[in-house]
């Protein structure tokens, strides 16, 4: 039996890809694998590389604060003229007092939406857009009306106006931002700008994963800002029932790279949970409750 050429199977050799959040965690894992598979990897760093270094040679390093519209404008202009696959892996955590709720919306969702509106013409026909959302976005269907309002906002400023008019909705910042990402994938998969050029659009919803944000999540989960206390709360909710463990960044970044590849050339509009089945338990528990 002749073994398949793995690089040819993925189809990244000589292709141009862009990865945000590429300097740590899941984004770094995805970017590193994409490089190993032969892609020309352009990375986006929020801190302009001052505090982060890659462990592989990038084709180009770009900067953008995804909470700043002017940065995204500049980034869209600086991106390569042809992009075969885009991987949006960046995000921030909500503070315990929700004081950064608006910033979370801008970085975790609105920045994605605005960049894609600006940069989609550069994405090649039959290319892919691949997003890291979160299991925190579970139940997005229940928030669909609010999510759709932001997804359908006709401009960046209109979305900001909506946020300003709905402070109670965005106060749970992280959850709503990830719900919006899920809604975006479902709403846009057959939008003309995607389907007419056969650009695939998918997202993954990671479960509890050890990344650069883990300490932030732990501290912000605790009313006292205590990381150990917050970690215990998170594990009690998500891991203890099945004696589970935290995932590694590679267990999320590698599947993301695969989803954007030729292997998944017929998959689009999907939100894939990588949570060791927790979302399935929630779904069946809800169905059982409805029967009762």
What do these predicted ranges mean?
Residues 96, 128-195, 208-211:
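Catalytic loop of short-chain dehydrogenase/reductase
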Residues 195, 200, 267-269:
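Short, small/polar-rich loop/turn modules that mediate ligand/substrate recognition or access, typified
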Residues 87-94, 277:
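Conserved NAD(P)H cofactor-binding loop of Rossmann-fold oxidoreductase domains
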Residues 2-8, 268-292:
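Short C-terminal tail/terminal secondary-structure segment
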Residues 245-274, 279-280:
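C-terminal substrate-recognition "lid" of short-chain dehydrogenase/reductases
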């Amino acid at each position: 039996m002749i073994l398949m050429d793995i690089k040819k199977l993925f189809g990244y050799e000589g292709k141009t890809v862009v990865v945000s959040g590429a300097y740590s965690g899941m984004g770094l894992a995805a970017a590193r694998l994409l490089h190993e598979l032969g892609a020309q990897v352009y990375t986006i760093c929020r801190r302009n590389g001052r505090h982060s270094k890659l462990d592989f040679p990038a084709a180009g390093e770009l900067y953008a604060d995804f909470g700043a519209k002017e940065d995204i404008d500049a980034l869209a202009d600086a991106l390569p003229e042809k992009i075969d696959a885009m991987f949006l892996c960046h995000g921030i955590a909500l503070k315990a007092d929700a004081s950064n709720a608006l910033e979370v919306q801008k970085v975790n969702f609105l920045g994605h939406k605005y960049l894609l509106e600006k940069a989609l013409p550069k994405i090649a026909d039959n290319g892919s857009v691949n997003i890291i959302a979160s299991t925190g976005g579970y139940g997005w269907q229940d928030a669909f009306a609010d999510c759709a309002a932001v997804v359908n906002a006709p401009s960046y400023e209109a979305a900001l106006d909506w946020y300003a008019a709905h402070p109670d909705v965005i106060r749970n910042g992280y959850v709503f931002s990830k719900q919006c990402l899920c809604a975006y994938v479902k709403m846009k998969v057959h939008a003309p700008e995607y389907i007419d050029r056969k650009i695939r659009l998918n997202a993954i919803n990671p479960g509890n994963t050890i990344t650069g944000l883990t300490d932030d999540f732990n501290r912000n989960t605790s009313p006292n800002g205590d990381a150990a206390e917050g970690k215990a709360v998170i594990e009690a909710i998500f891991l203890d029932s099945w004696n589970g463990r935290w995932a590694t960044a590679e267990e999320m970044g590698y599947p993301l790279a695969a989803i954007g590849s030729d292997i998944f050339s017929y998959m689009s509009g999907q939100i894939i949970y990588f949570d060791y089945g927790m979302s399935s338990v929630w779904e069946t528990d809800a169905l059982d409750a409805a029967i009762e």
